[in-house]
């Protein structure tokens, strides 16, 4: 296996991350990603737009909130509208009129989310389209080819994804296959000077398999690494231990992207564990259920208690929704057939995530991150000592106590 890395690592990958500050107690770090469409401050939360758009928010609004990188989905974009059409629009940036950075996933996650429509072999993943029923093969080469056509700033290797609750030989098979597919992705990548290919660490909840994957993949000189195969139903205790194992063995000078994580507590804890980048559909999805994210958790604005509440969602939030609209107004909209409330809540929830990560970053730079964590947990749970046990244990493992 080690021999396969030699050819794949012939050309030195660009260094796209500059560390600005590090927490002296935990593994938390603040940095900058130097990408083709501008600098991105880290830690960073990246909103998810499956098909070249966010649900409930425009690119102009996303820009105004300060978002400098968001996600697109290779599998869905590859099927519809298709890479050929997007390429004619000067890539995904031109197609969606987005002036900042884009990260496209490889399509591998659809092995889990569309498991009834997919079949995995060494060749790749054979899908049956949810749109027209036609069969298509997504190989490592095809995934990279589509992402090269899309022109995203960060592209992801195709990995063999299994649910985090799966155990046994399938997990080992997927881990080793992901290493082989990484080499095929590196070989197929036509634009390494303009698009940064990230590897994805697999291995499920097996520490030995994760360690093997980390050892092999870090031999490949790629610009960054993602931690995959988590946030899929495993216990939080299992989750944080796999994250901590991964960050302890990933290169310090390269970005660490924890895939599929978006709950506020998870973000803060995983920054402490050493992660730099996060994505999740949670803030937009929860908005569609009438839920607004706030420092104390969330507000279910459909509830009658908000019917005559004329305050903003969050008095400290600077987003357009909080500046212009009351809880009572949003409550009324949610009980009508008007979809505007979902739009307003999406704007707020994404703003909340971005503002949270900005505050986390500032606390790292100002060398007060442990105090920030205690204040955050105190607001979220009423008292930092009432924080969930898994989070307390995870933070203690990197030197942050909540008592």
From Swiss-Prot:
Zn(2+) binds at residues 317, 319, 322, 348. The active site is at residues 105, 279. One of its GO terms (cellular component) is transferase complex. It catalyses: guanosine(34) in tRNA + queuine = queuosine(34) in tRNA + guanine. Its EC number is 2.4.2.64. It is a peripheral membrane protein. This is Queuine tRNA-ribosyltransferase catalytic subunit 1. It comes from Homo sapiens.
